[in-house]
């Protein structure tokens, strides 16, 4: 997947699931299942319910995403 094909949106983490998966509600009201990107996992950045995050979505599957940034 090419980098320019991703859709970046902001959302709020609703629920923490096993294996570093999260239910995220996007700004437009949609809910997606998101996993943590490698850099966040590498640096042990904790993501908790209520955190505001940036999610990358593939145009092919808009129900799954990757968390790329957690706002402070």
Curated annotation (Swiss-Prot):
InterPro entries: NA-bd_OB-fold (IPR012340), RNA-binding_domain_S1_IF1 (IPR006196), S1_domain (IPR003029), TIF_IF1 (IPR004368)
Domain of life: Bacteria
Subcellular location: Cytoplasm
Keyword rRNA-binding assigned: yes
Boundaries of every S1-like domain copy: 1-72
One Pfam family cited in the UniProt record for this chain: eIF-1a
GO cellular component: cytosol
Keywords: Cytoplasm, Initiation factor, Protein biosynthesis, RNA-binding, rRNA-binding
UniProt GO MF annotations: ribosome binding; rRNA binding; translation initiation factor activity
PROSITE patterns from the UniProt entry: S1_IF1_TYPE (PS50832)
Subunit structure: Component of the 30S ribosomal translation pre-initiation complex which assembles on the 30S ribosome in the order IF-2 and IF-3, IF-1 and N-formylmethionyl-tRNA(fMet); mRNA recruitment can occur at any time during PIC assembly.
Family label: Belongs to the IF-1 family.
PANTHER family per UniProt: TRANSLATION INITIATION FACTOR IF-1, CHLOROPLASTIC
Record-given protein name: Translation initiation factor IF-1
């Amino acid at each position: 997947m090419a980098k320019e094909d991703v859709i970046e949106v902001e959302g709020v983490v609703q629920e923490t699931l096993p294996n570093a998966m999260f239910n995220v509600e996007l700004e437009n009201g949609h809910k997606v299942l998101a996993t943590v990107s490698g850099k966040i996992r590498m640096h042990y950045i904790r993501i908790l319910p209520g955190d505001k995050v940036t999610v990358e979505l593939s145009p092919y599957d808009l129900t799954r995403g990757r968390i790329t940034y957690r706002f402070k």
